[in-house]
Amino acid sequence: RQRQMCIRDRVYKHMDIGSAKIRPEEMEGVPHHLIDILEPWEEFHVVVFQKHCLECMEQIYDRSHIPILVGGTGFYIQAVLRGIDFTENEENTEYRKKLELLAEEQGPESLHEMLKKVDPVSAENIHANNIKRTIRALEYYELTGEPISVHNEREKERTSPYNFSYFVLTDDREKLYARIEDRIDEMMSQGLVDEVRQLKDMGCRKGMTSMQGLGYKEILEYLDGECSLEDAVYTLKRDTRHFAKRQLTWFRRESEVTWIDKGRFDYNEEKILEYMIRELGEKEIYEKQ
């Protein structure tokens, strides 16, 4: 068993607290991949992730181990499991620059309103502040005349080349939201503001992919004098709750998902693990020694 992260922020060095990056002592000797592989100013998106992930998986299979994809970015997981082909998505640099300028002059909401008109499904799933994804969706529509959400649904029907199990752990919504708020309070006490300040001193700015992550864009707005720290934390908690809701909506649309309600297992991790191993055995993916 070797784990690969499907969480964008964890690929970046110097971004530990806001991404809740696993510490070496927590890995328990299990190799973890796609952690600390990029500098914060480097570009990262699903195509780059897919390439890195598939390369790691080949290496893991060559060692007769089983890769475990861990994380909450459903589209990234789908890109690997379904082998989504991104080669047809040629970039329209001139149109992209036009959209980037529009976002700079009129704010990200202006792009999001444009997206609502041509692709309401994508607009529902993409946060208004996620300029990169909004531009990518608009660019795809400009190039093809088809909403990227239609393309993504079509790609979901691809047959996966892998024999896999897809587990989604869920919980009572109020408990989930309470954990989110507690986690953010903990990140603040661990020094999230200082971490973002260090990134800013290194030259990281709002438009960078790394700074689009939850926790980073809100605190950066505070450090840039755009809001108070109290407002930044409030926005972070609200947007993280909304993100969790969108995650669950995404996973509900996925096929072949095994839902695990932690409450039904009395929040006992050993019981949950035994259940997972039993399913892996039934699918002949893993045999317990």
Where are these regions (language model features)?
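Phosphate/pyrophosphate-binding catalytic cores of soluble transferases and nucleic-acid-acting enzymes
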Residues: 1-4, 8-289
